Every structure is written in C-alpha cells, then in structure tokens.
Amino acid sequence: MSYETIPTSDENFDRDVSATNRNVFGWYLYAFSSEPFIVSAMSTYFPLLLEEFARNNGVQVDDHTVACGAEDKHCVLPLFGRRVFVDTSSFALYTFALGVLLQTVLVISVSGVVDVCKTVRFKRNVLLSFGMVGGLATCSTVLLRGNQYYILALLTVISNCCYGVINVVGNSLLPDVVSDLKRVLYLYRVIDSDQLTTVISGRGSGIGYIAAFVVQLCSVWLLRQPEYRDDIRVAVLLVGGWWMLFQLPLIWMLDDVVVRENSTQFKWSRSRQYLKAGWQSLGHAAMHANLLKDVLIFLVGWFIISDSITTINSAAILFSKTELHMSTVNLVVISILTMINAVIGAYFVPQLLSERLELPPHQSLIYLICWAGVIPFYGTLGFVFQSIGLKHPFEMYILAVWYGISMGGLAAVSRSVFSLLIPRGKESTFFSLFSITDKGSSVVGPLLIGLITDKTHNIRYSFYFLFLFVVASIPVFNALNVQRGKVEAEELAGINESRLETNDGFA
C-alpha cells in the first residue's frame, strides 16, 4: 500500500498543506534565483568579458611581438606558451564549446543519482551545493587580474556546468511538487495533473524571466555609473550574488511531504552505480527513439536548428562588440530587447500560426526556421552592400526583436510538436533525450565558428555557416510526418501496456 493512501488527521493534513505550499514557492524561487545566470551572464556578460580579457592580452595578427592596441581591429591571443594563437573572439567561442561539452557529461552523470535518490530533500541539497559553487565561480570573476584569462575561462566553464546540473535537478522537482499539490487539493476539486504541471511550469518560467529582466535593468544602471563605467565584471558579480542570495531560502522551503516510493538513501560507496545509471538511462532513451522514425527525424533536425539558434546569439554579441564597437550598456539593452520579444514569441506566435493561419505543427516549425534564417542571411549581405547588412549599430536593435520572436516561438512550438511524437508513459525518458540533444548540439556551433574566425579573423564569415545550418534543417523537418509519428507512438505505448498486463497476469 502506498503511503499516500493512508488517512491523516486534520493536524497532519494542515501540516502537509503548509509543506506543499512551501515546496511550490521554493520551486518558484529556484527559477527566480538561477534564471538570470543563463539569460544574462551566459548569453551576454561572459562572451563580452572573455573577449575583453583576450584582447587585453592579445597581439597583432601580422606581428606576434606587438601587443594589441585599441585601434587594432583584429587581434589574436597566445595560448599554451605561445604555441597556439586564436582570434580574440574565438577564445570565447572555444570556452563555450568546452563548457557545454563538460556540462552535458556532468548532467547525464548526475541525472542517474537523482533518478535513484528521488527525495525532495536530496534534490534540494544538490541544488544548493551546485548553486553555491556556480554562484561563487561567477562572483570570483570580479577578483581576477587582467592577465588571468585562463582562470576566467575555467570559472566560466565551472559556473555553466553547475547551472546545467541545477537546471536538470530543478526540472525533476516539478513532478514531485505537482504530485504533492494534487494530493492536498483533491478534497476540494478534481485536479488534472497535466494542467497543473503546465500552470506551475508556466509561472516558474515567467518568474525566472522577471528576475532576469530585473537583473538586466540593474546592470544597465550599474554600468552607467561613473565608477563602474562599462566594467562588465560588476554585472557578472550581480548575477552571481543574486544566484547565491535567493537560493538560500530553499534550505527551509524544500522538503519531503510524503515518503517517495522506490527512493533510496544516497551513499558515497555506490557513487559508481549512480553514475552508471545516468548513462544507462540515456542508452534506453536512445533505443526507444530508434523505434520511432519521426522522433529520430525530429531530433536530427532539432540538433541542427538548436545549434544554429544558440550560436547566432554568441556570434551576434561578439560581432557587435568587435565590428560595430557597441558599448557594453548598448549590448545589455539588446539582450533585454531579445528577452522581452522571446516571451512575446513564446506566447503569441504558436497561437498565430496554429489558430489564425491554421498551419499544421511541423509547417509552423518550418515557417519559424525560415524566419530565424533571415538573421544570418542579413549578416552576409554586409559582404555585398556598403550601407546594409549589419553595418550600423541600429540594425542590431531591429534584429534583436526579430531574433527574440523566433527564439521564443521555436522553443514553444518545438516542445509541442515533440510531445505529439512520444509514447504515453515515456514522457520523462524522451524529454531527457530532447534536453540532451539541445545541450549537446551547442558544442558544434561555437567550435566551428571559432575555427572560421581563426582562419579569417572576421566573425562576419560565421553568418555564412549559420545560414547554411539553418537551411539544412528545413528538408529534415519537411520529412517529418506528425500524423505518422502519433500512430507509431500509440502503437509503441500499446505494446508497452500489453507487456505490463502480461507481467501482472503472471504475478
């Protein structure tokens, strides 16, 4: 018998209600504390800071004995005892590629531990531990001297890896929070789990974006102060401090309301088994995906377009700084514009495409990909024309709006399309594969853009690659048949259910 079916006294029930409410607010606070890191620091601040450190320690492209000056348009950074020279923009891109690679490995490994030790208390401790390390790594950038670019890259990788872990663990808390909330609300009304999950998840995302928006506004104010003029490290310090400060109440807010079935106590002696479980889970997910043709088509297409969309942001920020010479404050404003329009795109674009234009799901995805492809295509026009094609700073503000709408719309539509293709009862397995595809793809783009920039010393050439990548995803998604995928998913779900019934019959 499940513990959840045991009747409780009024006193115990009131205690459960109070604990459940704390868990809900704790989950919102997790998003509130951590979202500014990925939206502000990783998307804008760290690329600028890495390029700045690289330029300050760089040398001229043609003469490696002469230090890089303020008037030099392109410079290279000596690495590994001056054995290797990389473009100052490439340094940031290579750091991101390495960070995402290590983050993916760490996330897969940690997910095995979380799947075995399912208690809210354990997940809370993981959130606090990695959040504290990530926050400290972020804040530590303010202590660096101008020549410590290796340490800056290391701190960037550490903080990004920590965010990846708390993002996965935080998302795994959502089903627990919903389950507990449904348990205490069932006395008052019938609750639909999917609807409750959607509501809480949506509110959490909204709260996270509000936090990121507040941090961005505070950063603009700080960077405009005479004593902090364009010192991006102050903005990074704000993000790290925010992350650590607002996660502290989780110590008192997140805890178990009921005993979780099949949960085990964490033991250091079983660490190898925990790590192995994460990779086995990934293998099982890949095996399931291999049985569904349209899931494979979607994941291949998503690998391509997700990589392109993510890399467009990094390339555009670095391009704006190195080619258009935009100030840090202006680049933060561009980031704010992107974020606001991403929210608008996520809310209104799916409704416009499906209800007003009556487009089928996969065609909506293709329309959004074409919309996003305008950005790198417009960047390539700069090779042909003198007055358009990202030749002026004001063009970046227009493209920030365009990019935000495409990013928000793609995120919303892609998840809804993918949800139609997966079998019942396997949602967690397939969405973990979706998440890993999303994260893993972000290694390729920055790495290739870094190589292109090293070869040409002109980051504008990266727009050719990004445009080709966006275009390459269109025939892949055009081969997607959502109706066929739904039938395959239903058939696989039916097979799994019949196996369970057969096993029950022999029990």
From Swiss-Prot:
Where on this protein are sugars attached?
Answer: N262, N496
Q: Which UniProt keywords are given for this protein, alphabetically ordered?
A: Amino-acid transport, Autophagy, Glycoprotein, Membrane, Transmembrane, Transmembrane helix, Transport, Vacuole
The protein's location, in the record's own words, is: Vacuole membrane
Parts of the chain that traverse the membrane: 24-44, 90-110, 126-146, 150-170, 203-223, 234-254, 295-315, 329-349, 365-385, 393-413, 433-453, 462-482
Biological process according to GO: amino acid transmembrane export from vacuole; autophagy
Topology in the lipid bilayer is annotated as:
Multi-pass membrane protein
Any one annotated GO CC term: fungal-type vacuole membrane
* Top-level lineage group: Eukaryota
Does this UniProt record's set of keywords contain ATP-binding?
no
> What family, per the record?
Belongs to the ATG22 family.
Give the matching PANTHER family: AUTOPHAGY-RELATED PROTEIN 22 (PTHR23519:SF1)
Protein purpose: Vacuolar effluxer which mediate the efflux of amino acids resulting from autophagic degradation. The release of autophagic amino acids allows the maintenance of protein synthesis and viability during nitrogen starvation.
Indicate what this protein is called per its UniProt record.
Autophagy-related protein 22
Q: Which gene encodes it?
A: ATG22
